Every structure is written in structure tokens, then in C-alpha cells.
Amino acid sequence: MARNKIALIGAGQIGGTLALLAGMKALGDIVLFDVAEGVPEGKALDLAELTPVEGFDAAYAGASSYDAISGADVVIVTAGVARKPGMSRDDLLAINLKVMEQVGAGIRKYAPDAFVICITNPLDAMVWALQRSSGLPPEKVVGMAGVLDSARLRYFLAEEFGVSVEDVTAFVMGGHGDTMVPLVRYSTVGGIPVPDLIRMGWTSEERIAAIVQRTRDGGAEIVNLLKSGSAFYAPAASAIAMAESYLRDKKRVLPVAALLDGEYGLRDIYVGVPAVIGARGVERIVEVELDRSERAMFDRSVAAVEGLVEACLKIAPGLGK
């Protein structure tokens, strides 16, 4: 049986890490695409040469022409300008919007049946633009944000409680930015809700509030430490988890940026929500109950995303048609 084909648009730090993880997880053959001459070919060759060492069979190829992604089962988009110190995700809007329009056109022509995962920031606006530009069904175009933000929250909680990350569940809703909504009430350690652990004296509300804020600042913290570039290991692993759930029909419940169609009282907007990811893409959106405070935070996050989309439409009015 033919192996799946995974196309990675952008061969930078995230793209290279995606290619490594996809191969090691035996998800399929990998094509790295990048406009930088020689870079995708060089990384593909380097990766191909590690396959005998790691003992897996995957074909790696690099290209600077969109026809190389023809027939891809999964397309993961990282193309665009990365954040620099002092730069917000929103500062990237005008530059990366043009990139999404070009990438969307390439996907529409060469990989119209693919499951598309967008990583490019500002995430919620870029995945919206990518879906509009590609014309693919909304359930086949998602953004990677919530898996990463939730992983950061889980890691910080595991550190706080001195337990394995495997025993911590948590998820983050809303936009991928300063207004994201880490849901402490739905976070657990070994099945025990974090609010109960606060009452048991394991931690304090103040320490959990600090963890919530650190989660919101997670990307910026790494950007400031690196001085040049942004996070790439955890974002790549998060996108691969989404791709694996689709390719293997695992039906994992993952927080992703999905297009809402009435869920949470919203329509025609991409925002982070828990969803079932299987062979049909986004198979179901999970509507969790939000209390008044959580809903207020979620609404603020949605408003921030709506502002970005409006800014996109001013730059590229054609996307609204």
C-alpha cells in the first residue's frame, strides 16, 4: 500500500522538525517546500541520510515549486515571517497574509483533498485567510494553537505539583494570543480538578494565576530567550499530533482553531475550541459549558480575532467574497 504524502510548506526550524517527527512516527513520505533556493533540498537530503541510523523508511524530497505537493494527504503550513523580540503576533499580519494567499492558491491547485494545518501567526487570522484562499472545506483546514498552548499549561502544572505530565490534563480555548483562555476549572491531575487541589492545599490561587499568565506569555518567553527566532520543537510536535489523529483516524479530542458554524453562538470565525479530529478532519466540535467569567474571557478573545480578520479584509478585500 502506498505511503501517505505529507507536504510541509516552509522549511525553517519548524518545518525541519516537522519532517523529522513525521518520519520517525512513520506517518508517510515527506516533501519540504520553500522559496529559499536549496534550503528544502538540503534539509531533505540531511533528513534522508538519518533514516538508516534511526531505522525507518520514508522518502524525503525538497522543492521550490508547488507542483511537488501534488496529491498530498496532509499539508502543514509554517511559511511566513517568524516573531522577533518585541514583535507581537499581530505585527506579522500584513506580511504573512500575502504568504497565506499564495500558499492557499498552491494548495487549491495541487492538493485540494488534503487536511491542512496552519501554524503561521497570527494564527487565527492566518488559518481563516488560508481557508478562504484555498477554497477547501472548513473541516479540512485547521489551525495549530490550542494543542501547543495546552501542552505549555500541562507542563507548568506538572512542574507545580511535582507529577508526571502524563497525569495532567488541561486545555486552552480562544485565540492564539494574549487573550487566550486557559481553563483551570477543566484542568486535572490524576483526574482531580485543579480547583480541588487548591482547596486541598497543594497550591494557591495566586500560583495558579501566575501559571495561567505564563501560559499566555509562553511564546514570548521563548522568543525573548532565543533573541532570534521563536519556538519550534513544541509547535512541530503539536501539529504532528493533529496530523497523526487525522491520518490514523484516532479521533483524538484536541483543542484546535476550527471554523465555527453556530457552536458557542458564533459563525464564520476561526477560534480555538476542543474538537474531534479523525479521517474526515474536524468531525465534531465539543461545546463545553463556560461560566460567566470564562465566557467573558472567551468573548474578549473572539473579539480580538474578529479585529484581526477585519484588518485582513482591509488589506485583501477579496477574501470576504
From Swiss-Prot:
- UniProt KW keywords: NAD, Oxidoreductase, Tricarboxylic acid cycle
CDD domains for this protein: LDH-like_MDH
Q: Can you tell me which residues form the catalytic site? A: H176
Q: What is its EC number?
A: 1.1.1.37
Give the superkingdom in one word: Bacteria
Pfam families referenced in this protein's UniProt entry, alphabetically: Ldh_1_C (PF02866), Ldh_1_N (PF00056)
Query: Is the Oxidoreductase keyword given for this protein?
Result: yes
Q: What does this protein do?
A: Catalyzes the reversible oxidation of malate to oxaloacetate.
Family statement drawn from the similarity comment of this UniProt entry: Belongs to the LDH/MDH superfamily. MDH type 3 family.
**By what name is this protein known?**
Malate dehydrogenase
Q: Which organism is it from?
A: Xanthobacter autotrophicus (strain ATCC BAA-1158 / Py2)
What's the encoding gene here? mdh
